[in-house]
Amino acid sequence: MRRSGANSPAGDSLADRWRAARPPVAGLHLDSAACSRQSFAALDAAAQHARHEAEVGGYVAAEAAAAVLDAGRAAVAALSGLPDAEVVFTTGSLHALDLLLGSWPGENRTLACLPGEYGPNLAVMAAHGFDVRPLPTLQDGRVALDDAAFMLADDPPDLVHLTVVASHRGVAQPLAMVAQLCTELKLPLVVDAAQGLGHVDCAVGADVTYASSRKWIAGPRGVGVLAVRPELMERLRARLPAPDWMPPLTVAQQLGFGEANVAARVGFSVALGEHLACGPQAIRARLAELGDIARTVLADVSGWRVVEAVDEPSAITTLAPIDGADPAAVRAWLLSQRRIVTTYAGVERAPLELPAPVLRISPHVDNTADDLDAFAEALVAATAATSGER
């Protein structure tokens, strides 16, 4: 059964508005957790800035874009629940984590994170010498709060790192409760909101929130953001500190120093403004609604098991193969034969937890129940068509 509000006027209005703001889709896009479709406004803003660079020079154009970029920073701070955060643009989420951990103060380097931590994040943590301690979890991968409280109080790490929604599974972590726990224990909380910003509520005032432009906010690729509580920012020690002969730079300025694609940052800032204009709460509700519909229509597709509970408040649906279905072959068939864009997620996404590859879909608010019905039918065909390729 579909959720009763699946085709509600409010949902249709948001879907229509989102769809009209973008170029027509070439096929069926169910891959926003990888990269959403940009709007005309974001595309035009980036292009106009690039043209302005050609007209007046890159540095003059960057100065002219300062107000737009400041608005983008303010939007990120608001969506993180930390209005006074110092916000640094990066090239993506992984770059943001690299900047943060490479600048972390003190000699002690321990952090607690989920067993399902994103593989590349684990690589960055190891590169910066952090000892990783797994947080206790429930069967569905959600943090076990009571057990985590005992663990963190008994042997506090230097920081807690929480990926609010994983790359390999659409379970939303209880972020607000973890934030409260970390506040009570006086532990810095770092939130990986790559899959969270614009998708689930991240406004909990964590000490650090970092995210990507290209996913649920639907901005350009190659841009990310690092938002840090001012008190913590002052404690960070940039890997490349400003030399004595340079003018004084704040820590945030040191972290953000270097070459940048300002046009992409402008596009990201515009996309953030569009997200706020559409209403973050309405977007979150619509995304959760689509996740509910997807899991319902896919529950009985032979050869696959839906990983998330039907009412999980996220738009991501993960399909684990059973009876020998091949996620990589199915993903390729869906793209080549039906122009349906999905994600094949290998075990490297979560090397400490994911036992086998999975198939992931992630609709945005412009997708419909009919789209998800069409995907279910195509999945049946793809599974049958690729069954002999094993």
From Swiss-Prot:
UniProt EC number: 4.4.-.-
InterPro entries referenced in this protein's UniProt entry, alphabetically: Aminotrans_V_dom, EgtE, PyrdxlP-dep_Trfase, PyrdxlP-dep_Trfase_major, PyrdxlP-dep_Trfase_small
Enzyme class: lyase
Pathway stated in the Swiss-Prot or TrEMBL entry: Amino-acid biosynthesis; ergothioneine biosynthesis
Cofactor: pyridoxal 5'-phosphate
Swiss-Prot/TrEMBL catalytic activity: S-(hercyn-2-yl)-L-cysteine S-oxide + AH2 + H(+) = ergothioneine + pyruvate + A + NH4(+)
PTM-bearing positions, type N6-(pyridoxal phosphate)lysine: K215
Keyword annotations: Lyase, Pyridoxal phosphate
GO MF term set: hercynylcysteine sulfoxide lyase activity (ergothioneine-forming)
Statement: the UniProt record of this protein carries the keyword Transmembrane helix: no
Keyword set includes Lyase: yes
BP GO terms, sorted: ergothioneine biosynthesis from histidine via gamma-glutamyl-hercynylcysteine sulfoxide
Family statement drawn from the similarity comment of this UniProt entry: Belongs to the class-V pyridoxal-phosphate-dependent aminotransferase family. EgtE subfamily.
Entries under HAMAP family matching the protein: EgtE
Function: Probably catalyzes the conversion of hercynylcysteine sulfoxide to ergothioneine. Ergothioneine is an antioxidant that protects mycobacteria from oxidative stress.
Name this polypeptide is given: Probable hercynylcysteine sulfoxide lyase
Species name: Mycobacterium tuberculosis (strain ATCC 25618 / H37Rv)
